[in-house]
Regions:
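C-terminal substrate-binding/catalytic core of Rossmann-like NAD(P)-dependent dehydrogenases/reductases
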Residues: 43-59
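Segments of small-molecule ligand-sensing domains
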Residues: 56-64, 78-150, 163
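Extracytoplasmic/secreted envelope proteins and their assembly/folding machinery
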Residues: 18, 47-51, 74, 78, ...
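A short beta-strand-to-alpha-helix junction
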Residues: 42, 63-73
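Short, low-complexity, Pro/Ser/Thr/Gly-rich segments in the mature regions of secreted, periplasmic
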Residues: 153-164
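Extracellular/periplasmic bilobed ligand-binding domains
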Residues: 1-40
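Short, surface-exposed amphipathic charged segments that create phosphate/polyanion-binding patches used
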Residues: 26-27, 48-52, 134
Length: 164
């Protein structure tokens, strides 16, 4: 108890999605909201499957955004490696690296766990580099060991948002 009334909004960063936060905060976590690329409260079928897989495999209550981003990274690399024309010989290391980079740049519309489709491109512009611009606003509805969250909003910004 820090003496902060329940009527005061409490905002956290994406790290607030990590399990120790609601476990340590207990009932004080209720009403805290934050943004992250993934919410375990997401109702999409892929999210429900991911949540169940991580519960079974790792014995955790709910996966956080770090779990989801690692999963998406591995899946995107899998797509790129399948599509890259690789030699895999000792003398082809530089060419293979370029082929992998180019294959990643050609991934478009990957529908993973992130809050929106992920696309890459070869252009070195902020619009291309910064990729998905969908933020998810998440709130704790229950704290403690068996914490619960809800998705409060999703906001997708235009590729040029904040660049003017």
């Amino acid at each position: 108890e820090a003496g902060i009334g329940e009527d005061v909004r409490r905002i956290g960063s994406s790290s607030a999605s990590n399990a120790p936060v609601p476990k340590i905060a207990g009932d004080a976590a209720k009403g805290v909201f934050f943004t992250a690329a993934y919410a375990a409260a997401d109702n999409r079928p892929i999210a429900k499957l991911f949540n169940e897989m991580t519960r079974q495999r790792y014995g955790i209550h709910a996966p956080d955004h770090d779990f989801s981003q690692a999963y998406d990274l591995v899946r995107i690399m899998e797509i790129a490696l399948k599509n890259a024309d690789l030699d895999l010989s000792d003398g082809a290391l530089a060419a293979d690296r370029t082929a992998i980079r180019d294959a990643i740049a050609n991934v478009e519309g990957y529908e993973g766990l992130a809050s929106g489709p992920i696309s890459f491109c070869a252009a070195p512009t902020p619009q291309c580099r910064d990729g998905n611009r969908t933020a998810v606003l998440i709130g704790y509805t229950k704290g403690g060991e068996n914490f619960e969250t809800e998705v409060l909003a999703r906001v997708t910004m235009e590729p040029d948002f904040g660049l003017e």
